[in-house]
């Protein structure tokens, strides 16, 4: 039986593509071991799904000048580097796969030193620092999105998303179950795992103004736990607006919506692509290397999304744009066709494509 190590964790954007790959490799009767950060939130999901894992005490390179942070980084780097060697020596993998982020680094470097085949996956169009370094040591570099960065031996494979996005569903039932009217145009709003107060408030102002003047559109806002109480006060008495702290089946709600307002992380981009949903993208302004901006620009250039930078004028810009398209369905149809220009791999098949690739190493 062939053995695979998958370094995956830190954020949902790095973990869930790796988790999808792990499930696909297990279907093929391979043994899979995950390497994750110590006390990673991903451990709960791995345990629930009976995956073996090992923890390393690693952290990302500090981007501040604080010397204490650099000292802590150096200490954790040395410790985790040797932890990783112990994991590899004990498990004896045939292939190591890094799914992006700093966790990939020690795994991919040791794979190179020990002559083990490896692959690295980056979901973003702007390649991260750790992955740029890993690219020098790996056999093949797998791209979630096209990139202009100078990386050798690449293959465009897409970013895996949850298989639930491919399930059959009934739009009317999905909307009615949330107190929404299936006869109205539906705008879905969510901020991702790094949703912010500024984004929530700008969008709430927009939604309130639009429903006062237009009774043919409704909003469903997934706020996150932190923003929920404040927004509940904001939306009190507003018609055609539904607020939820969390949505466990966003895969149905996104497909039921006519339009989406969201961040532009790589997993969200892949989900929008799979659903062919017109969108307004508001990049998380503190993302490393501003990668969400570049992800969003890919969709904007194809005509399937608009992009606004988070700032003081966000609320009026959102209001003007969404109010305009809510009156013109032809714009939405044009934006949906824009996805055809991208010609990306099907995110619902990306896990299979990646598994085929690493299987062949």
From Swiss-Prot:
InterPro entries listed in its UniProt record: GlcNAc_MurG, Glyco_trans_28_C, GlycoTrans_28_N
EC supergroup of this enzyme: transferase
Record's catalysed reaction(s): di-trans,octa-cis-undecaprenyl diphospho-N-acetyl-alpha-D-muramoyl-L-alanyl-D-glutamyl-meso-2,6-diaminopimeloyl-D-alanyl-D-alanine + UDP-N-acetyl-alpha-D-glucosamine = di-trans,octa-cis-undecaprenyl diphospho-[N-acetyl-alpha-D-glucosaminyl-(1->4)]-N-acetyl-alpha-D-muramoyl-L-alanyl-D-glutamyl-meso-2,6-diaminopimeloyl-D-alanyl-D-alanine + UDP + H(+)
Coiled-coil ranges (or none): none
Residues binding UDP-N-acetyl-alpha-D-glucosamine, per UniProt: 11-13, 124, 162, 193, 292
Membrane topology: Peripheral membrane protein
Chief place of localization: membrane
GO CC terms: plasma membrane
Localization annotation: Cell inner membrane
Alphabetical UniProt keywords: Cell cycle, Cell division, Cell inner membrane, Cell membrane, Cell shape, Cell wall biogenesis/degradation, Glycosyltransferase, Membrane, Peptidoglycan synthesis, Transferase
Pathway: Cell wall biogenesis; peptidoglycan biosynthesis
The keyword Transferase appears for this protein: yes
GO terms classed as biological process: carbohydrate metabolic process; cell division; cell wall organization; lipid glycosylation; peptidoglycan biosynthetic process; regulation of cell shape
GO MF terms held by the record: UDP-N-acetyl-D-glucosamine:N-acetylmuramoyl-L-alanyl-D-glutamyl-meso-2,6-diaminopimelyl-D-alanyl-D-alanine-diphosphoundecaprenol 4-beta-N-acetylglucosaminlytransferase activity; undecaprenyldiphospho-muramoylpentapeptide beta-N-acetylglucosaminyltransferase activity
Signal sequence annotation: none
EC numbers, comma separated: 2.4.1.227
Biological role: Cell wall formation. Catalyzes the transfer of a GlcNAc subunit on undecaprenyl-pyrophosphoryl-MurNAc-pentapeptide (lipid intermediate I) to form undecaprenyl-pyrophosphoryl-MurNAc-(pentapeptide)GlcNAc (lipid intermediate II).
Family label: Belongs to the glycosyltransferase 28 family. MurG subfamily.
Entry protein name: UDP-N-acetylglucosamine--N-acetylmuramyl-(pentapeptide) pyrophosphoryl-undecaprenol N-acetylglucosamine transferase
Organism: Elusimicrobium minutum (strain Pei191)
Gene: murG
């Amino acid at each position: 039986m062939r053995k695979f190590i998958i370094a995956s964790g830190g954020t949902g954007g790095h973990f869930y593509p790796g988790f999808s790959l792990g499930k696909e490799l297990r279907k093929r009767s391979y043994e899979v071991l995950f390497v994750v950060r110590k006390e990673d939130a991903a451990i709960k999901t791995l345990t629930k799904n009976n995956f073996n894992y090992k923890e390393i005490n690693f952290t990302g390179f500090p981007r501040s000048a604080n010397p204490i942070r650099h000292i802590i980084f150096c200490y954790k780097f040395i410790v985790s580097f040797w932890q990783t060697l112990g994991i590899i020596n004990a498990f004896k993998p045939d292939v190591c796969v890094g799914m992006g982020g700093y966790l990939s680094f020690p795994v991919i470097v040791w794979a190179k030193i020990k002559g083990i085949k490896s692959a690295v996956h980056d979901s973003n169009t702007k390649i991260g620092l750790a992955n740029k370094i890993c690219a020098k040591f790996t056999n093949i570099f797998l791209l979630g999105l096209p990139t202009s960065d100078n990386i050798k031996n690449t293959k465009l494979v897409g970013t895996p998303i949850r298989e639930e996005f491919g399930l059959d569903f009934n739009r009317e039932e999905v909307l009615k179950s949330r107190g929404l009217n299936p006869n109205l145009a539906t705008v879905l709003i969510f901020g991702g795992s790094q949703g912010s107060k500024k984004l929530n408030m700008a969008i709430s102002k927009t939604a309130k103004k639009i429903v006062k003047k237009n009774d043919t559109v409704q909003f469903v806002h997934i706020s996150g736990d932190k923003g929920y109480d404040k927004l509940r006060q904001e939306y009190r008495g507003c018609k055609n607006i539904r607020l939820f702290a969390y949505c466990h089946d966003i895969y149905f709600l996104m497909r039921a919506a006519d339009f989406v307002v969201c961040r532009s992380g790589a997993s969200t981009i892949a989900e929008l692509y799979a659903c062919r949903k017109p969108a307004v993208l508001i990049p998380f302004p503190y993302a490393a290397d501003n990668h969400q901006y570049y992800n969003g620009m890919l969709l904007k250039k194809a005509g399937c999304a608009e992009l606004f930078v988070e700032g003081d004028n966000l609320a009026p810009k959102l209001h003007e744009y969404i109010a305009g398209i809510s009156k013109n369905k032809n714009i939405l149809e044009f934006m949906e066709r824009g996805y055809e220009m991208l010609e990306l791999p099907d995110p619902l098949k990306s896990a299979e494509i990646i598994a085929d690739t690493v299987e062949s190493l």
